[in-house]
């Protein structure tokens, strides 16, 4: 039997390790599409999530977060590009899915809940619904990221607005179809404009006002293009889904899948700590005032009720139109929040 010299063993071993590591690195370097601005706290949390996965896999799975839609992949197209693996992972938010998945879009609309307590009760049901629905699209819900308790305010330039009557004379920016429908019921003209285009739309007069939470107004420099704001309703803060392309996910070793799920669960726990949310909202409003935004008295109780009533009609209609599981999903959420 011919014996290989030790140097040959070493050379062969080195070549094997080099080759397998090359394949390994190429297969598990993933892109994550995040449509939110890099300055948002959620974006910072996603960076931390990616670091946690990298550390847990000893660098074997490297997830690079691309913020602000820098990959050129649009939020409302996520059900089209994510299953193909154009990016292996992406942030999925049901509010953007109205065109391709009306049943998902109808799960939980703006105005679905009337308080933060109701919203917190709805979250476990929402997670179950999204997990089941996204799997039908070839998307693995590897985890979730919660939103803080947010408060939707109407930011306007020019004439101060803190009543629905005045809002009827303005052009309003919103972010989802259900909001267009709800405001239409109130006689308000609203149009969908992405947050990356919102600043220019306000500056150039495409719209006069925008629905946005005070907590995040600084991330899109709203104080530069508006001069007043007033609170209208509690935001139905749908949890974001950390979606993964199923065909890419299946190529991961189980240990890596578990690392992603574990890091995602830690992210969800951090993002659903609501202890300081009310204080943060107050501080955000004060900061905006210091930057020149006049914080007005809230919309009246009757206006707030009118918005929630209009939203309830929109939600019911959207569920009926969507068909399938939409009505059952709505019933599950109503039961969870005690209605």
Predicted features and spans:
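Bacterial N-terminal signal peptides that target proteins for export
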Residues: 1-12
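Sec/Tat signal peptide C-region and signal peptidase I cleavage site
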Residues: 18-25
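Signature of the catalytic double-stranded beta-helix
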Residues: 120-133
């Amino acid at each position: 039997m011919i014996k290989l010299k030790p140097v040959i063993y070493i050379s062969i071993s080195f070549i094997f390790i080099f080759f397998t590591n090359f394949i390994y690195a190429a297969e598990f370097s993933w892109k994550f599409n995040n449509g939110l601005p890099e300055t948002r706290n959620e974006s910072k949390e996603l960076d931390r999530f990616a670091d946690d996965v990298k550390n847990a896999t000893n660098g074997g799975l490297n997830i690079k977060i691309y913020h602000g839609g820098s990959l050129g992949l649009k939020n409302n197209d996520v059900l089209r590009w994510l299953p193909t693996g154009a990016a292996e992972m992406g942030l999925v938010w049901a509010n953007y899915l109205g065109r391709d998945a009306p049943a998902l879009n109808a799960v939980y609309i703006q105005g679905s809940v009337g308080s933060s307590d109701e919203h917190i009760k709805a979250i476990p049901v929402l997670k179950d619904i999204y997990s089941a629905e996204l799997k039908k699209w070839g998307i693995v819900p590897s985890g979730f990221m919660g939103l803080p308790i947010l408060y939707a305010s109407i930011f306007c330039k020019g004439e101060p607005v803190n009543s629905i009557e005045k809002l009827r004379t303005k052009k309003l920016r919103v972010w989802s179809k259900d909001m267009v429908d709800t405001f239409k019921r109130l006689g308000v003209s609203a149009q969908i404009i992405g947050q990356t285009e919102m600043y220019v739309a306000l500056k150039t007069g495409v719209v006069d006002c925008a629905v946005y939470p005070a907590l995040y107004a600084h991330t899109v420099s709203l104080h530069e293009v508006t001069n007043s704001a007033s609170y209208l309703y509690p935001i139905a803060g749908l949890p974001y889904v950390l979606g993964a392309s199923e065909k890419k996910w299946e190529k991961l070793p189980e240990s890596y899948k578990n690392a992603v799920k574990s890091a995602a669960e830690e992210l969800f726990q951090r993002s659903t700590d609501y202890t300081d949310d009310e204080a943060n909202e107050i501080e955000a409003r004060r900061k905006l005032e210091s930057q020149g935004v006049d914080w007005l008295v809230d919309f009246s109780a009757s206006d707030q009720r009118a918005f929630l009533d209009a939203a309830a009609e929109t939600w019911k209609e959207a569920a009926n139109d969507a068909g399938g599981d939409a009505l059952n999903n709505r019933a599950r959420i109503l039961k969870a929040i005690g209605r």
